[in-house]
């Protein structure tokens, strides 16, 4: 059976590994360390690569291809991986089945400024926005209604934790945030804020074949984000009630962009007007909350695998709406938020695959406030310096 190589070690990759393994697909994990959530899973075989971005990733993928011994399907889990693979697709296509939009479209969709212009051009409903860079001064903010959200154009900075999407309530605050961000990136996008709570944010997860036809599509709703309103998905559920409307917008997007492969769109409904707008796409990779689809009966990674190989895909049955996925045990929905009988599945903890959960708990205890406080008051022996804390890996922000 043709194997699949999943790239990356964070929670996103772990969800993909478990989804593929549940379909009986042999899974390799390309990662630079075993000590990460996906690397500790018993449901994949680890193959070390020197880096998870840039030429180091490309060289690593070419190296492990020889060890695998046959052409494998490749599934990515971060934006920097997509950029590296897209640039090197000519070298990688001999060893991997790649399913990506064209190089030009990857560049457009992954740059927030270019995506804003492209979305407006093809008629996608997106929040009004301006770009601040060397060619556009801060007076451009005057055309926007406050509050706004300020985002680095380079999405890799968000995934790397260098910057985060930030809300600004006044023009002065927006200027301050934009100036700070521009110390790390040359351009920022400033979007008008869409009024609503965490649960007004929905998403679609999909797979397209080489003719830009949607082979599978799942619609979900965020229940908790971290940080609230602007952060990554912490808890989410299926959103069958939104499927028809969001599927139509997703279809328009994939048709116009000639999309190929795995991807996603994030939406937000304006609480007062009811209008739904596209916030941003997930391009060429699995989403942070990808596993919710699998848990509800739509195994997006497994369908992406079969589609990449040109194999037929079985029709998807009824979506199980009595399941919620959460990124960590630290997130607890308020009473009454979820329907009675909803089963919450933790992204890390599984009885049949326990080590990722142990890793999650260990990193939480090592980095939590009580642990930091205790270490301040416990005198460390001079002969045994304290070990470096292991920081918990966070799920990807884009789309998630």
Please tell me what each predicted stretch does.
Residues 148, 213-215, 275-280:
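Protein kinase-like catalytic core scaffold
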Residues 1-101, 135-139, 370-398:
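ATP-binding N-terminal substructure of ATP-dependent carboxylate-amine bond-forming enzymes
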Residues 192, 260-272:
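A short glycine-rich, hydrophobically flanked beta-strand micro-motif that places a catalytic Asp/Glu
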Residues 305-400:
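Peripheral (often C-terminal) accessory segments that flank ATP-dependent C-N-forming ligase machineries
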Residues 108-189, 198, 205, 210-213, ...:
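Active-site nucleotide/adenylate-binding loops and adjacent lid/helix of ATP-dependent enzymes
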Residues 272-331:
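Active-site/pore-lining binding-face segments in mid-to-C-terminal subdomains
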Residues 169-172, 192-258, 282-308:
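ATP-dependent carboxylate/phosphate-activation module, predominantly the ATP-grasp catalytic core
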